[in-house]
Regions:
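Conserved catalytic neighborhood of penicillin-recognizing serine enzymes
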Residues: 149-206, 222, 249, 261-290
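Beta-lactamase-like hydrolase cores
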Residues: 53-57, 68-99, 183-186, 199-200
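Short active-site loop at a secondary-structure junction
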Residues: 90-91, 116-137, 151-157, 224
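Second-shell loop/turn segments in exported
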Residues: 1, 27-35, 59-66, 121-130, ...
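Mid-domain, small-residue-enriched loop/turn segments at the edges of structured enzyme/sensor domains
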Residues: 167-170, 202-238
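Active-site SXXK
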Residues: 75, 102, 129-155, 185, ...
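A penicillin-recognizing enzyme superfamily signal
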Residues: 65, 69-84, 96, 107, ...
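Non-catalytic, structured segments within soluble enzyme domains
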Residues: 1-66, 211, 216, 224-225
Length: 333
């Protein structure tokens, strides 16, 4: 306590006395940039904490995440500084998952977002079509897993009309290439062979295969979904991770441990589930290597000396206002 005389003396001191000089707005420059780099990731971590029953602002938690800051910085710089986007209005959503354990090591929800904090995270939004990135997941993966198709299985790229309709399925070049192998159809991303494959596999088995990879929806899938489903970049990344690790699906996660105020530590490390045979994972991965070479659909993404296996995807605008443009472009691998 203090005496009355000390209290009276303290009241006479200006509140400005002893204050540090003004150093400027620390939200500018380096601090603001650092916050933007991890913005999308932190937003999802906060959401996960709330889902687990915590108040991240008042509970005094120590949270360890799976973020790889170096990878996150590279991702941020690539999207905001390195890649030559045609316009600052063009957006992106990226998720990077460790195939060995499901850890989300980097994530980007957008680019050139200005002063927006915790804005739309496109990496977890599920309202955009995946395009052809779904073909290994819904068409060819199930064909290998359930029908034991070899990579040289013959498939037909010929005129196809969706059953019960007069809707003719076309490819980007409005051409048909006749009989080809499953490998060629996947590498060249031909639509008709993919839908014919799904028709043979059946919606039920395709749905089962997708569910094993963490992907589902309330409505029943249809044949049209064989060339596109509504899914997030994070879901696609986690599903493709199963191809890379030999067929095991890990539910992606951000938080590795939480320590509460009373010193109790909870650790998180989801166990993987077998989603497909090792043979299926190997065959799909082997075919996806060809996407970056020869007649593959991603030859412009080829990197010398880098082990690559992946799949492109694209979606058209819903109207004819952009007849030669693509609304979304995907890359998964």
């Amino acid at each position: 306590y203090i005496s009355q005389s000390q209290a009276n003396a303290a009241k006479q001191v200006s509140i400005k006395e002893g204050l540090d000089p003004n150093h400027g707005n620390t939200s500018d420059n380096s601090v603001q940039v650092k916050e933007k780099v991890v913005d999308s990731y932190v937003k999802e971590v906060l959401s996960q904490l709330v889902a687990k029953g915590y108040n991240p602002y008042t509970d005094g938690l120590k949270v360890h995440t799976n973020l790889d800051l170096s990878a996150q910085k590279h991702l941020y710089n690539a999207a905001n500084n390195s890649v030559a986007f045609q316009s600052d209005k063009m957006q992106t959503g990226v998720a990077v998952v460790d195939p060995n354990n499901g850890q989300i090591v980097a994530m980007l929800g957008g680019r050139k977002t200005g002063n927006v904090v915790y804005g739309l995270n496109r990496a977890v939004q599920t309202d955009r079509s995946s395009g052809s990135t779904v073909k290994p997941l819904m068409d060819y993966g199930p064909a290998i897993q359930y029908l034991q198709w070899p990579t040289y299985k013959s498939v037909e790229d010929t005129k196809f009309v969706y059953p019960g309709t007069n809707k003719v399925l076309h490819d980007f070049d409005n051409q048909y290439k006749g009989t080809m192998t499953m490998r060629e159809a996947l590498v060249q991303s031909r639509n008709v062979p993919a839908i014919r494959t799904l028709q043979t596999v059946g919606i039920s088995r395709a749905t089962k295969f997708l569910k094993g990879l963490g992907i589902s929806q309330s409505k029943a899938y249809t044949l049209q979904n064989g060339i596109g489903i509504y899914v997030s970049p994070l879901q696609i990344a986690a599903a493709y991770a199963a191809f890379a690790n030999g067929g095991t699906y890990y539910k992606p996660y951000y938080i590795s441990s939480i320590t509460t105020q009373d010193g109790k530590t909870l650790t998180y490390s989801p166990s993987g589930k077998r989603a497909m045979s090792k043979a299926t994972a190997y065959m799909i991965t082997d075919m996806l290597k060809g996407v970056f070479t020869g007649q593959g659909s991603a030859t412009k993404a080829y990197l010398s000396g880098v082990y690559q296996a992946g799949k492109t995807g694209s979606t058209d605008y819903p109207t004819s206002s952009h007849p030669d443009g693509e609304m979304d472009s995907w890359m998964a691998g």
